Amino acid sequence: MAIIEAVGAREILDSRGNPTIEVEVALDDGTTARAGVPSGASTGAFEAVERRDGDKTRYGGKGVEDAVHTVIDTIAPEVLGFDASEQRLLDTTLIDLDGSSNKGKLGANAILGVSLAVARAAADSADLPLFRYVGGPNAHLLPVPMMNILNGGSHADSNVDVQEFMVAPIGAPSFREALRRGAEVYHALKSVLKERGLATGLGDEGGFAPNLPSNRDALDLILVAVEKAGYSAGTDVALALDVASTEFFSDGAYQFEGRPHTPEEMVAYYTQLIADYPMVSIEDPLSEDEWDSWAHLVSETGDRVQIVGDDLFVTNPERLAKGIELKAANSLLVKVNQIGTLTETLDAVTLAQRSGFTAMVSHRSGETEDTTIADLSVAVNAGQIKTGAPARGERINKYNQLLRIEDELGDAAVYAGRTAFPRLQG
């Protein structure tokens, strides 16, 4: 038993230069650990509330000094003396202390920082890697890196509607080889863009952010890059999208590619896209409250492709349960800061997997050097992780942590590859 002896917090910067919170925990056996909390650019309306100061004279109102003081003055006195290994009890205490439905009283950023820092401290105290501490003896599956190599939408200053164009190295024999293939396609894409006189500036998540005539042009460029890198599209490397369609949905229509689209037109667009490209996954293809449209898309395409709920579910078990009942998706995007505690995150993943859904663990566009999500993806045997392009330190550190985990697992390590996408099988 290791007892929580001290809890501290500080304001740090995320990868976009905005403030976020870092929490540090000390145990009575001398163990210390810290956790940094990420922040999103395109956020779902139903996410747990991130607490910001609102003081326009500091960081344009985005400071988190109030959240820091909440950890030190309100949360710390309640959790000192807790057994750090009692994660569910700790998280339940934090949820009850907040008392709101969306963690808006204390702030999900304050709560999550404590939840993750305690988990890491408990793992270190037990002399276990975090993935093993959280996942137990069966944690062994290395995820397919869903690498966002071309950025649009809210992640880039470009005219491209779709937020993320990803490559998935499904044919690689190991995570190490998958990472290599993804990086080689990324560099090939830069070369292709340069050859065509297109911009090679980077978006928030390390992908290139050129202006393009259409979203299909982005996919076509990536296919050229896959071939240029020496790989076969669909066999070695597949494609995936995060449309983030809530960002361009208003008054019942999607402002997409220069004109309004009805939900039915969007479903038809995606159906044709899936027929034309080696697509394995589409995230947030429709707006976060268009449940019937989601169910329609799944009925049309769900036997062939993964339809991922991000803003739709916000890693919330209650919204996920509704989606399962309505057959509104077949995959869950997992973001720890959307729900605000490690326990609730694990509960959402368990519900998804028991219901036949896949799960994709994800970063946020505003990231820190924290690598928890790399361990989490292995802990829950998710089979998929989304943490940006193979560029920018806050993205690379997650990939590098997965390389270390693969080495640590040795012969027990299994790379998910094509099995991460059951609709590809057979």
Curated annotation (Swiss-Prot):
Subcellular location: Cytoplasm; Secreted; Cell surface
Superkingdom, taxonomy of origin: Bacteria
GO BP terms, alphabetized: glycolytic process
Catalytic reaction equation(s): (2R)-2-phosphoglycerate = phosphoenolpyruvate + H2O
InterPro entries xrefs: Enolase, Enolase-like_C_sf, Enolase-like_N, Enolase_C, Enolase_CS, Enolase_N
UniProt-annotated binding residues for Mg(2+): D242, E283, D310
Pathway(s) per entry: Carbohydrate degradation; glycolysis; pyruvate from D-glyceraldehyde 3-phosphate: step 4/5
Similarity remark: Belongs to the enolase family.
Main location: cytoplasm
Keywords per UniProt: Cytoplasm, Glycolysis, Lyase, Magnesium, Metal-binding, Secreted
Function: Catalyzes the reversible conversion of 2-phosphoglycerate (2-PG) into phosphoenolpyruvate (PEP). It is essential for the degradation of carbohydrates via glycolysis.
GO molecular function, one term: phosphopyruvate hydratase activity
Descriptive protein name: Enolase
Organism (species): Beutenbergia cavernae (strain ATCC BAA-8 / DSM 12333 / CCUG 43141 / JCM 11478 / NBRC 16432 / NCIMB 13614 / HKI 0122)
